Amino acid sequence: MLSGTDFVKKIKEGNKELFEASRSNVRRFFASKPSDEYLVEHFRGRMVNEAQNMYAIAGQVASADPSTDVKDLELLSRQAMDEAKHFRMVKEVIEHITGEELDVAAAFAAEAEKPQAKGASLLDKYEASDDEAALAAYQLVAEGRAEAVWNEMATCVEDKFISSRYATIAKDEGFHSNLGGRALSKLVEGSEALQSHVLALVEKMRVDLLEISNQNTATPLAVV
C-alpha cells in the first residue's frame, strides 16, 4: 500500500498519456482552421461545461457535513468561484467572436438540443456528489487534463483576446487539479481498499475522457 502522497504521484504519472493525446487532438482541431460559426459552437459547449462544473462544486460546498475541514471548504469554494469566472470568460469569448451580446438561456437550450460530450458529465456517472474520493479523483484527473488542454488551446489560438483567457483558465484548472490531489492524498492514507477503489475509477475516467476528446475533435464542432 502506498502513502497518500505516493498514491497521488502514481496517478499523475499515469495521466501523462491521456494529457498528451488530448493536446494532440487540440492541435489537430485548430490546424483545421475552423470557421467562426464552428468556434461559436465550440465555445458554447465549453461555456455550458464550465457552468456544470460550477453547479456541481457549489453543490458540494452547500451540502458539506459540518465536520468538514474549514480549509477544505475554503478551497472548494474558491474552485466554485473559479468555475463561475470561467463561465463568464467563455461567454465573453463568444460575444467577442459574434460582436453581439449572448442570450445565455438560448445558448443553454441550443446545447441541450445538440449536446457535445463534456467532462463534467462524469461527475454524475461516477456519483461524485455522494463519493468524496470520486470527486477528488475527478478533480485530479479531469481538471489536470483541462489544464493541459486549455494551455494547448492558448498556444494554438491566434486571437490574443481568446488566447489570454485560455491561459488564465488553464492556470486555474491546474490549481483545481492540485486541490483534488490534496484531498485524495488525505482520503486514501492508510486505506488499501479505498486506494483500489480509486484506481479502478481513475482507469475508467481516463478511458471516458479520451473518448470525449476523440469524439469532439473528430468534427469541427469540438469541445476538447
Language model regions located:
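Non-heme di-metal
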Residues: 1-224
